[in-house]
Amino acid sequence: MKRVFLWLIFVLAFHKLLAEKIGDIASVVGVRDNQLIGYGLVIGLNGTGDKSGSKFTMQSISNMLESVNVKISADDIKSKNVAAVMITASLPPFARQGDKIDIHISSIGDAKSIQGGTLVMTPLNAVDGNIYALAQGAIVSGNSNNLLSANIINGATIEREVSYDLFHKNAMTLSLKNPNFKNAIQVQNTLNKVFGNKVAIALDPKTIQITRPERFSMVEFLALVQEIPINYSAKNKIIVDEKSGTIVSGVDIMVHPVVVTSQDITLKITKDPLNDSKNTQDLDNNMSLDTAHNTLSSNGKNITIAGVVKALQKIGVSAKGMVSILQALKKSGAISAEMEIL
């Protein structure tokens, strides 16, 4: 026990040199959220609810009234103050009976707005068909741009718990959020160095099986494991939001020399110095841009995604055009990184 904590103190003292904690890059298999869903009614709407043409809404109103001993045919209901909605929620791990969770409500009929209404008691089911929570509450005006959906903070009460016996377990499995052979071995070796050999074994690039040392309970063991710093190798990734034009990438993602054409735009990327001084603009990091010939030079240095984006902005390329060029760079092999388009 003493050796473990001394090692942890030593590592944590140099945490600035390390990228992540194991708990940040890996999750415990089986310890996860469970999705809940339910169908219900929002009442008290000021004429903005579903119209009588929404047969399922009128039938639901009839069923609700019948449950309180009021019998009326769905065909006789003409109310516009009620809207049919779907309710979704996430049941967190280890949630206990009586705990509150947030819910999200969305209209499924032809209502104009559900703002200002009240969700009547609605059971929320999991995929196994069991009821795990009951939702109910007033809908407070939130997003003025979307009147047909809303959130209710603490809008549901947990009625059934997901049983999970963590205390008596001797072995668990860690799942890396981003599978990587190097990271899996790194986690394995780090845990074995801290707790002793054969505590951890990497089964594949994503999965590490860990066995609890006898001197710890599983809760204590996992608490220690999640706090251990580790050198984390992340894949290069570029995220592009085409609508807003936002581009997120690592600062050191390099772009190899290439000529790329997309739509009406041609961009030449080179390490050679530029000759046309009249049309050359100096950018950051020793880069230069020939605006007449759309040529970007790094003057012998490495060119990064950040430099390419800045050059495209100088040329006046639209957000959509930037996305096209970045995709073309990826396809040509000039970029060694994953790309995600939002």
Swiss-Prot record:
Molecular function GO labels: structural molecule activity
Keyword list, A-Z: Bacterial flagellum, Periplasm, Signal
Record's subunit section: The basal body constitutes a major portion of the flagellar organelle and consists of four rings (L,P,S, and M) mounted on a central rod.
Chief location bin: periplasm
Signal peptide residue numbers: 1-15
Gene that encodes it: flgI
Subcellular location: Periplasm; Bacterial flagellum basal body
GO terms for biological process, alphabetical: bacterial-type flagellum-dependent cell motility
Coiled-coil zones: none
Chain's role: Assembles around the rod to form the L-ring and probably protects the motor/basal body from shearing forces during rotation.
Keyword Signal annotated: yes
Superkingdom in the source lineage: Bacteria
Keyword Metal-binding assigned: no
UniProt protein name: Flagellar P-ring protein
Gene Ontology terms: cellular component: bacterial-type flagellum basal body, distal rod, P ring; outer membrane-bounded periplasmic space
Family label: Belongs to the FlgI family.
